[in-house]
Swiss-Prot record:
Name of the molecule in the record: 5-methyltetrahydropteroyltriglutamate--homocysteine methyltransferase
UniProt key word Transmembrane: no
EC number(s) stated in the UniProt entry for this protein: 2.1.1.14
Keyword entries, A-Z: Amino-acid biosynthesis, Metal-binding, Methionine biosynthesis, Methyltransferase, Repeat, Transferase, Zinc
Organism: Bifidobacterium longum (strain NCC 2705)
Name of the gene: metE
Amino acid sequence: MSTLTSVSGFPRIGQNRELKKIIEGYWKGANDLAAVKATAAELRAKHWKLQQAAGIDLIPSNDFSYYDQMLDTAILLNVIPQRYARLSFDNQEDTLFAMARGYQGDKGDVTALPMKKWFTTNYHYLVPEVESAAEIKLNSTKPFDEFNEAKALGIDTKPVFIGPYTFLKLARTPEATELELDKGLVNAVAAVYVEVLAKFNELGAAWVQLDEPYLVLDKEPGDVELFKTLYTKILSAKGNVKVLLNTYFGHIADVYETVNLLGFDGIGLDLNEGREENLEAVAKYGVASNTTIFAGVINGRNIWRNNYATSLGLVDALKQVTANVAVSTASSLLHVPFSTEGETGIPAEDLKHFAFAVQKLDELKEVAALADATEDEKKASAALAANQALFDGTRVAADPAVAERIGKLSDADYVRQPAREERQALQREALGLPLLPTTTIGSFPQTKEIRAERAKLRKGEVTKEAYDEFIKAQIDAVIKKQEEIGLDVLVHGEFERNDMVEYFGQNLNGFLFTKNAWVQSYGTRCVKPPIVWGDVSRANPITVEWSAYAQSKTDHVMKGMLTGPVTILNWSWPREDITHEEQTKQLALAIRDEVLDLEAAGIKVIQIDEAALREKLPLRKSDWHVKYLDWAVPAFRLVHSAVKPTTQIHTHMCYSEFNDIIRDIDAMDADVISFEASRGDLVVLDAIHDAHFETEAGPGVYDIHSPRIPSEKEIEDRIYEILDKMDVKKVWINPDCGLKTRGNAETWPSLENLVAAAKAVRAKLDK
């Protein structure tokens, strides 16, 4: 019998971001919901047929979503807070969008659900909110409709769900204690999954996949018992459906013995990020006789080609324990671009080193075929030989100048002088800012006109000189508008930048760029990460000309805007032939050069965004420092350690759980940090207070990911919440994040309310 192949999930935005475009058109009133549904159905059919043509045995369904799979699960379970239910939309999609984006209109005014990073990825999920009065019940036909959709095309699929354990651990359950979820809630959730399996029994599904990535985290008291309670109920009622427990982003060695005894038909193990521990657990505890191990050998989180010899070695190691081994993607392919097809900007000799989602289907099938081959057949295999050739020899030559510069670094290069308290006093005097200074995070809306002008430059339809004049006009206008509404520290708007990471990559040595390698970040927001191809260095100044021009146009303090080294790496496709630490040092030195040039050009405030610092923190607490923070935090210090005491260094961080690393963030030794905080109900304030946080801070006072406009009173209330926990002298007032993806129609009224709120609070404090 040939080795089964299984795909955990497939990208849903479409090869050309069709889903993004049709949904955003619906939000703007350019098309109706029927058009959205038609495009979605076309994409699903295309993606199923692609996987069928590639010969994949277990093709996923229900991995499609209009916005987010956790949000879909909340709706499936009827976990819809009353504030959204009361909007009384006549379709489930508009309720979903209101939960994801907030709503402000004739039906009411509600903020969006909180949004957080999905484990260590750059994907964001909506945090479900389980109200005490929630009636947990099966509330959606989506999984069954999509299964039948595929069946009508002649394709049998494997329905995929976020599992109940992960859902409950990630949901906000206000009435539950930290250690023990309400048993009524647990039983109700389990009952819905039982009902789901019963329906798939009726529909004739062979397999159902339940994703439980939360299993790879450290366990709290009661976690294992919760998992057992849920799955004892679910598996006892599974009927003829085979249940695949799928785990990813780490290992489950600490619970593998328990999982193995529960009676799952399949257990999916990540053999990229949890390789050694998972293999050791399987070797130690064996595999139940009726269980198939799904070996996650095809990495769902990178774009480099799979090393077949390595994958075959992993499959062979499992086959020493059990004959029941399938090969699978290590996680959903949601986190990689669609296809390398059409990437003509990358030389063919380089492109052959990459595999996007479509190419990973072929890799999966080839690994499965080779796993079934005899040793003689492997030796004769052209596919195996061609694959091995990619890993033999040197892919790219090293840059000796980069290595030499890193080799000369000393401990002093990672320490800024004088101490922060002394610097803060000097900076207050030098900058002359008021109490509760107001600023923005950096970017302003990139209108259709700006994007069109950039496209013209790319196509050679306008000269570089004409484009630069256009950008200068945008900068002039945004400076004037910021001055008019009364912001204290201004920014130039970043109109020259397509993306905060790609822009820097395009101006550094060592990067490759794609035309269409988009991946979903949240909802319809997509990103196109650059590829770290070789050693990184800065050839010329990148931002200095624009920042210096902007400063020349105002007497206000102008903030220089940079992306930090950890974020550039975390939001790029990193190399696999050298460590992340080494790549980050290279980037830190390149950005350090830019910081010093900005300072020399008269820029007194420089923001070095580390938006993605938290997201790559290892999932196991014991790994936090030794595998990440011990080099990530010093890399940031290396960037700014040589500036003058009067130069104020800012940083910014995006949606994350900051509380547990708040002291490490303080150790970055920035002068000011802004947090994305409003969707997290400002819980970071308690951590700042309890840690005696020394860095000045601006927890975001309104959510920029929602189109709604916060009132002056709403922002004023937020400021007082902040002042309850922070020293007023250390508080900055700013939005949650950059404003690039917002429209001018909501941006300026929101900022006017922000400035008015800050002034109102200042006035009351002065009395």
